């Protein structure tokens, strides 16, 4: 039934109204058809993107889980999606249990209950019959030391919480916090707060025991020996630092920087002196350990053998024998022989061998002269 048409209308008017309604319906169908076709064509693309997002998230989860569990990524390179999700759930549950345990350990009510129970047990131990007085005293002393250690740990945790609450404070100069144990070396590094974090982390190696030796703690922070106030603050890298407030005068900042530079120069000079002393000691020790060197004379091949056998005899002869020109024979009255002049032997005229001073050396190369062979002649 077409609305707006009465019985008094002519057949032509009725036909035109029906045709117009059909045309409108066809136009609406033509408009809806492209929308549906676009949705069908975009559906595979959206599905592909969704799967890509899922795969990327799973890969990131796998990397994080392997790093958290300290496992080798090379051995677990191929993990199924179900394994990745299962490991993630287990890791989150473990973290949740650890956080709950830490909260319970830091809860003052639970700690007080634990200390009360510990004290009751210690009292019961003191009532054991048959214990020696010395042994009982040592046992009670040990138990009291244990409970005092629990109190010290509680105080340390409360202090850490107080330091964590000061993270929102603004700073101009950063100083590393004093050590929590005697084994740690105290350090000081004044750094401008407006600078980069890298510069502040690189300058935290300079030690200054003179600064943290007499630090006084107060409700408002710490006070240095020169009366300067610092506030504990946690840095982005996780370390705790003492921070100067913004109201600090510029003169005090410059004074602190000058003190730090002077102390650093003194440390460098002391290190250089220690290095020089160590080097001198090493050189002296090396000289003491070096072997003695003996001078050896140079000899030729031709005179080496002869001089080796006769040098001792020649040198032992008295020097007066070489000074005499002739030999005195016995008197003719007692002998029938005629006197005869005797020339001094060539061997006697050979002077004493004087060793020339040679350079010290462990290895001496001998100079060997090769003599030319002469042909034999009968005349």
Swiss-Prot record:
Domain Orange: 114-143
Function: Pair-rule protein that regulates embryonic segmentation and adult bristle patterning. Transcriptional repressor of genes that require a bHLH protein for their transcription (e.g. ftz).
Chain span(s) of sequence motif WRPW motif: 376-379
Originating organism: Drosophila virilis (Fruit fly)
Record-linked InterPro entries: bHLH_dom (IPR011598), HES_HEY (IPR050370), HLH_DNA-bd_sf (IPR036638), Orange_dom (IPR003650)
GO MF, one annotated term: DNA-binding transcription repressor activity, RNA polymerase II-specific
Interaction with Topors, as annotated region: 36-55
Keywords (A to Z) from UniProt: Developmental protein, DNA-binding, Nucleus, Pair-rule protein, Repressor, Transcription, Transcription regulation
Keyword Nucleus: yes
Gene Ontology biological process terms, A to Z: cell morphogenesis; open tracheal system development; periodic partitioning by pair rule gene; response to hypoxia; salivary gland morphogenesis; tube morphogenesis
Record text on subunit structure and interactions: Transcription repression requires formation of a complex with a corepressor protein (Groucho).
Biased composition (Low complexity): 182-207, 301-328
Top-level taxonomic group: Eukaryota
Protein name: Protein hairy
Domain comment (free text): Has a particular type of basic domain (presence of a helix-interrupting proline) that binds to the N-box (CACNAG), rather than the canonical E-box (CANNTG).
